[in-house]
UniProtKB/Swiss-Prot annotation:
Lineage start: Bacteria, Pseudomonadati, Pseudomonadota, Gammaproteobacteria, Pasteurellales
Gene: hemH
One term under GO cellular component: cytoplasm
Residues binding Fe cation: 196, 277
Keywords assigned by UniProt, alphabetized: Cytoplasm, Heme biosynthesis, Iron, Lyase, Metal-binding, Porphyrin biosynthesis
UniProt GO BP: heme biosynthetic process
GO MF: ferrochelatase activity; metal ion binding
Pathway: Porphyrin-containing compound metabolism; protoheme biosynthesis; protoheme from protoporphyrin-IX: step 1/1
NCBIfam families in alphabetical order: hemH
Biological function: Catalyzes the ferrous insertion into protoporphyrin IX.
Major location category of this protein: cytoplasm
SUPFAM superfamilies: Chelatase
Identification of the protein by name: Ferrochelatase
EC number annotated for this UniProt entry: 4.98.1.1
Catalytic activity annotation: heme b + 2 H(+) = protoporphyrin IX + Fe(2+)
Length: 323
């Protein structure tokens, strides 16, 4: 491959409904919840339950939450992802890299399949896939890999590709997180690292997501010079009745005041883009949860989104693959 060869860069994230309506959300959730990487229950049991009970009820409830955060540009996740794409494209241009940067979603639009087709149509000679999940999990990064592999199955010619597995202790990522926290965290605030949870059963089956979360947290804590009583780590967004990774974020915040934690700042290092889970669940629902249970002040520290340190980190991950 020559130095001027065109590179396709695929920024992958979870996805979003096309609109904040129950019908659109139901269609999106069907894609999401029928992926065996996400829910591995037998189809004969899971699908009827999903169709008859879960989708009708959950779609209506979630629609209200999406409507509360929807923008003229669509969902925050999609709008910010587009900004990330443009910013990364500009960064790679300054590095004289002949690249076409695209965003793609595991569920919803733009799909990974359609994005890969578009890149190949534009004759890229190599694709670099960057799942925007710093910490590997089979239910997120693994699902991106499946979707990307399925997209390539339709092609007779297999384009060379690189798949960035994780970047949970990448120096530029840790520095970006630490800098974002440093300019916002007050000296009397307890810092809570909240990560999206996964079923405990998945960990027992070999998913090492929790360990990646721990390594990220410890690296940031060391960078900031925090003591043991100044921070904690929890897991959010559990779904269903089975046990997930603990401690649970909502339960921790309910009882934090009884542990003499009156002022708190929450950051979600696993989210590269602010979305429903951070804006609605963490910044709104859990704020109310903490304050109504004796807390005095609550701060949500936003995702890295389009901060220049975040875009530069992405760019350097790409450049490392091209070295």
């Amino acid at each position: 491959m020559t130095k001027s060869a065109k590179i396709g860069v695929l920024l992958a994230n979870l996805g979003t409904p096309d609109s904040p309506t129950p019908k659109s959300i139901s269609r999106y959730l069907w894609q999401f919840l029928t992926d065996p990487r996400v829910v591995d229950l037998p189809r004969c049991k899971w699908y009827p339950l999903l169709k008859a009970i879960i989708l009708p009820l959950r779609s209506k409830r979630i629609a209200k939450n999406y409507q509360a955060i929807w923008t003229e540009q669509g969902s925050p996740l999609l709008a910010i992802s587009r900004q990330q794409k443009d910013a990364l494209q500009a960064y790679l241009d300054t590095q004289n890299i002949n690249a076409q940067v695209e965003i793609a979603m595991t569920y919803g639009n733009p799909s990974i399949q359609s994005t890969v087709k578009n890149l190949l149509k534009n004759q890229v000679e190599r694709i670099i896939v960057l799942p925007l999940y710093p910490q590997y999990s089979s239910s997120t990064t693994g699902a991106v890999f499946d979707a990307f592999a399925n997209a390539l199955k339709e092609e007779r010619g297999l384009v060379p590709f690189d798949f960035i597995h994780s970047y949970h202790i990448d120096e530029n990522y840790i520095n970006a997180l630490a800098n974002s926290i440093k300019v916002r965290l007050k000296s009397d605030e307890f810092l809570l690292f909240s990560y999206h949870g996964i079923p405990l059963r998945y960990e027992k089956m070999g998913d090492y997501y929790r360990e990646h979360c721990k390594q990220t947290t410890i690296a940031v804590v060391n960078k900031l010079g925090l003591t043991e009583n100044q921070w904690g780590m929890t897991f959010q967004s559990r779904f269903g009745r089975e046990e997930w990774l603990q401690p649970y974020t909502d339960k921790f915040l309910e009882s934090a005041a009884t542990q003499n934690i009156q002022k708190i700042a929450v950051i979600c290092p696993g989210f590269s883009v602010d979305c429903l889970e951070t804006i609605e669940e963490i910044d709104k629902e859990n704020r109310e949860n903490f304050l109504t249970n004796g807390g005095q002040s609550y701060q949500y520290i936003p995702a890295l989104n389009v901060e220049h340190t975040h875009i530069e980190m992405m760019g350097k991950l790409i450049l490392e693959k091209l070295a």
